[in-house]
Curated annotation (Swiss-Prot):
Active site: 274 (proton acceptor)
Pfam families linked: UL97
InterPro entries membership: Herpes_UL97, Kinase-like_dom_sf, Tyr_kinase_AS
EC numbers on record: 2.7.1.-
Name of the molecule in the record: Phosphotransferase UL97 homolog
Any one GO biological process: viral process
Kinase listed as a keyword: yes
Keywords: Kinase, Transferase
Length: 512
């Protein structure tokens, strides 16, 4: 009996040492990579701390152009849906425990879609004088959308020579043509989603203004399975001309993206589910962002997933149908930009559906805004130090790749998932001085309660977080009122531990 107890104790000690070494080695490596790169190099000094003695010759020209763009953007009645609140009444269905909600299988719903298609007839008269995809009708079972032939301008888009391949992925290929970007889609589901989303947006009054920061299609062709968009120079991920001098511009850009997400969720009842730096396309003039749009709707889903989407296409006379797929928490957002609360559920219950966490438009909206906060976190690191940001991003992606490659049944996947959360908590703590005392402690408490076997290691990490100093260079951002608002946005979105809770105002009122 004594030998069994000693063996069990020895096994427990070995297990503790294993987890302790795992956490401490990774944390030490990440901390060293950051601390060794907190001093500004010459390139960073030029980017982030402009010298008044050597101003750029085009400075006045750039400032004039930026002010002109800003004045033009602000003269319209822009949306300011930046206060996301949720009713917490006991009668709300969102109050139920997400782990106890029945998850309707996508197979059963696909069978229902097939049955619905047999019942729906095409109203050919509705195509007359139709110029854009338009909702025809909506029932408890389906939403009917008509797509006209005129809208799919093959002569201008599909038949144009493809000048250059911009990129290729699992969803299709993107080419640059004379009229913009044409994307060849491999699957029907994405082109159906694009048609439905456009029909949903244009039914909102004043959609041209509200959707100014959403990348919507210029043309959809069901015959060639292509979608055409306006061309943008780059995306936020590859943007590397960050400057503290442009903080007002960056804060204004993220404010516009917040309005776009609120419009998409609160007015169009659509969740993006893939907000990331690579999906935010921008036009720039040196360090200034002139225009930014949120694109890539391959994971975009309607809040009410029970209705089938049926497309009547004038091009080939066929009726196409699609139903919402079951988006699990692990299949939404890129892991680097996944909200911390969502990452916690990935570690504890990876098969959970997002519809079990969010039931109302405001809850889906908070989830998308939290992902945008993660984008702002890595973006702001570039303002502090280019080398620091590169080190942090390299460390994050290496850990995240290990997490994604691990098999579901492997215990290391949970360990890497915890490490992802800890890294994110540490970065936000070093970026926002008051974050840990306000919100970070509650996340650490949840981790300790969920994984009591790691309690000693997590307590050690908790102590480190409590004593951690801000990144060198944060003070420069804090001294700027626009930088302070940007850090507040990061802190608020990172501290969300339940999408049902009110997020509150995420930016102060925009003043021109």
């Amino acid at each position: 009996m004594l030998s069994k107890i000693m063996a069990s104790k020895s096994q427990s000690v070995c297990s503790f040492k294993k987890y302790k070494n795992f956490f401490m080695n990774n944390v030490r490596l990440l901390r060293e990579s950051i601390l060794l790169n907190t001093n500004h190099d010459v390139v960073t000094e030029q980017k982030c701390h402009k010298s008044d003695q050597n101003p750029k010759r085009s400075r006045a020209k750039i400032q004039k152009r930026y002010n002109s763009e800003k004045k033009h953007a602000c003269c319209v009645s822009n949306l300011h849906l930046t206060c996301v609140e949720v009713s917490l009444s006991s009668s709300s269905p969102s109050q139920s425990d997400p782990r106890t909600v029945d998850n309707d299988s996508s197979v059963a719903r696909k069978k229902r879609v097939t049955a619905y298609l047999q019942q729906v007839e095409c109203d050919e008269d509705f195509f007359k004088d139709l110029r854009l995809p338009t909702k025809h009708s909506e029932t408890d079972k389906w939403t009917l959308v008509y797509v006209p032939r005129v809208f799919s301008d093959c002569d201008s888009y599909c038949a144009r020579p493809r000048k250059r391949l911009l990129g290729a992925g699992s969803y299709g290929e993107a080419y640059l043509t004379d009229r913009g970007v044409t994307k060849k889609v491999f699957s029907n589901s994405e082109i159906l989603a694009e048609a439905y989303m456009l029909a949903n947006i244009i039914q909102v009054e004043g959609w041209e203004i509200h959707a100014a920061h959403l990348r919507i299609a210029n043309s959809i062709c069901f015959r060639h399975n292509t979608v055409s968009y306006t061309f943008y120079k780059t995306d936020l991920y590859h943007f590397n001309a960050h400057s503290v001098d442009a903080l007002e511009n960056y804060r204004y850009t993220f404010r516009q993206l917040c309005d776009a997400i609120c419009f998409l969720n609160l007015r169009c009842k659509l969740v993006h589910a893939d907000v990331s730096a690579s999906n935010i396309l921008i036009n720039t003039d040196e360090e200034y962002i002139l225009h930014a749009v949120l694109g890539d709707y391959s994971l975009c889903s309607r809040h009410d997933r029970e209705r089938a989407i049926i497309i009547m296409n004038e091009n080939n006379g066929k009726s196409l149908g699609v139903c919402q797929s079951d988006l699990q928490v692990e299949g939404t957002y890129q892991i680097v930009y996944r909200p911390l609360h969502l990452m916690f559920w990935c570690v504890t219950m990876r098969t959970l559906s997002i519809w079990q966490l969010c039931r109302e438009a405001r809850e889906f909206c908070v989830m998308d805004l939290c992902a945008l906060g993660r984008v702002a976190t890595l973006f702001t690191l570039h303002l502090i130090s280019h080398e620091t940001s590169v080190s942090v991003r390299r460390g994050l992606f290496s850990v995240h790749k290990k997490y994604e490659k691990e098999k579901t049944a492997n215990g290391h996947k949970v360990e890497y998932g915890i490490h992802v959360i800890l890294n994110s908590l540490w970065i936000v703590t070093c970026l926002c001085p008051t974050f840990y005392k306000q919100s970070g402690i509650s996340m650490m408490t949840k981790l300790i309660e969920a994984f009591p076997q790691h309690e000693k290691c997590l307590n050690t990490y908790t102590k480190w977080l409590g004593e951690e100093l801000p990144f060198r260079g944060v003070g420069i951002i804090l001294e700027n009122k626009y930088g302070q608002e940007l850090l507040d946005f990061i802190s608020k979105t990172s501290g969300v531990d339940d999408f049902r809770k009110p997020l509150g105002p995420i930016f102060e009122t925009l003043t021109v």
